[in-house]
Regions:
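Solvent-exposed alpha-helices and their adjacent loops that cap or buttress functional pockets
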Residues: 31-36, 40-41, 70, 129-132, ...
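Active-site glycine-rich loop that binds ribose-phosphate moieties when present
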Residues: 122, 151-164, 168-189, 220-227
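N- or domain-start disorder-to-order transition segments that initiate the globular core
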Residues: 19-37
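Divalent-metal (Mg2+/Mn2+/Ca2+)-assisted nucleotide/phosphate chemistry catalytic cores
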Residues: 90-167
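Glycine-rich nucleotide/cofactor/substrate-binding loop typically near the N-terminus or early
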Residues: 45, 50-52, 57-112, 234-248, ...
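General beta-strand structural signal in soluble alpha/beta enzymes
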Residues: 41-43, 76-80, 119, 137-142, ...
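A C-terminal functional module that forms or caps the active site or interfaces directly
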Residues: 232, 236-299
């Protein structure tokens, strides 16, 4: 296959232009899968570094990879290490992603690589990295979006910008629980990003299986999701968000609202908000939110793999 050529929309490629070769390292397993046009699913490292305390973060990352493999796809966990964007981290490399790792959106990848720092990719950062080799499927917990209180401050996740630019399918349990869900869905519509419910008619509210805004379409199988994504991309579309509800619902909406208000009162802003909210939720729910969070992340990775496998068979 010629260098840098995508054989059909979303199939992926085994190589990348020589100009970026010194910045990217692709694991042999991932490279082989892309070369053979087998399904590959991207996984982020922010969940490993900042979503859970050590060693739970690594355990969740490995469980997500196992779920991808069980569904018949190849996992590609992404992060920045030793001056390179690594697509397909090893287990020992995952162990280097702790709370001191930089949190990388699309804008941060280059500086982190050049400066030789350890960088954990967000959804947006993972999508940007995955795009360099043509990976179009990703599983995660929740998408970033519009923070509560917008426009004071005007805080909107770079995940949405990446979704607006990059043709990819992301499986999540809706958007992050601390966000303004309604405003985020409105912005997704403005950006032309389909919000697809997996066997549900409303967007999951991360910890809760239902109760969010209506989705733009519903699918009832991985094959149907793959066909919707294929048609969307053939028509020139960008990302597709597939909302998979958690298997177990928690009613923590009031608790989240109180913790978000506390973060605001304490002057916690930007990338520091999510870790603060997650830690407080864990403490005040007696560990229930962290358990549900772990389970939905792994399940979403598995569904992303099922959709990737179905897409490869189209």
């Amino acid at each position: 296959m010629p260098l840098g050529v995508v054989v059909r929309p979303g199939r992926g490629r085994a190589d990348y232009p020589p100009a970026v070769e010194h910045l990217i390292r692709v694991a042999d397993e991932v490279r082989a899968a892309l070369s053979e046009e087998r399904p590959v699913v991207a996984l982020e490292t922010t969940l490993v570094a900042h979503g859970f305390p050590a060693p739970t973060g690594v355990e969740v990352g490995l469980a997500s990879e196992a779920a991808v493999r069980s569904a018949g796809a190849v996992p590609a966990t992404i992060g920045v290490l030793d001056g390179k964007l690594v697509i397909g981290l090893t287990e020992s490399e995952l162990g280097r992603f702790g709370p001191d790792a930089r949190k990388l959106g699309p804008r941060d990848l280059a500086a982190c690589a050049v400066q030789g720092a350890v960088g954990a990719t967000t959804v947006g950062g993972t999508l940007a990295a995955a795009q360099t080799v043509g990976i179009r499927f990703m599983g995660t917990g929740g998408l970033g979006g519009v923070h509560r209180g917008f426009p004071t401050p005007p805080d909107v996740s770079a995940d949405l910008g990446a979704c607006a630019r990059i043709p990819a399918l992301i499986v999540s349990s809706g958007v992050k629980s601390l966000l303004d869900v309604g405003a985020t869905v409105e912005l997704l519509e403005t950006l032309g990003i389909p919000v697809v419910g997996y066997r549900v008619d409303t967007l999951p509210l991360f910890y809760a299986a239902e109760g969010g805004p209506p989705v733009s379409a519903r699918v009832d199988s991985a094959d149907e999701a793959a066909r919707v994504a294929d048609a969307h991309w053939r028509l020139g579309g960008n990302a597709v968000l597939v909302g998979r509800p958690p298997d177990e619902s928690l009613d923590v909406a009031d608790l989240i609202e109180a913790i978000v208000a506390e973060a605001h009162d304490r002057g916690i802003v930007g990338q520091a908000v999510t870790p603060f909210v997650l830690a407080a939720l864990h403490e005040r729910s007696n560990g229930e939110t962290r358990r549900v969070n772990r389970d939905l992340i792994v399940a979403n990775a598995g569904l992303a793999a099922e959709v990737a496998v179905a897409y490869a068979a189209l």
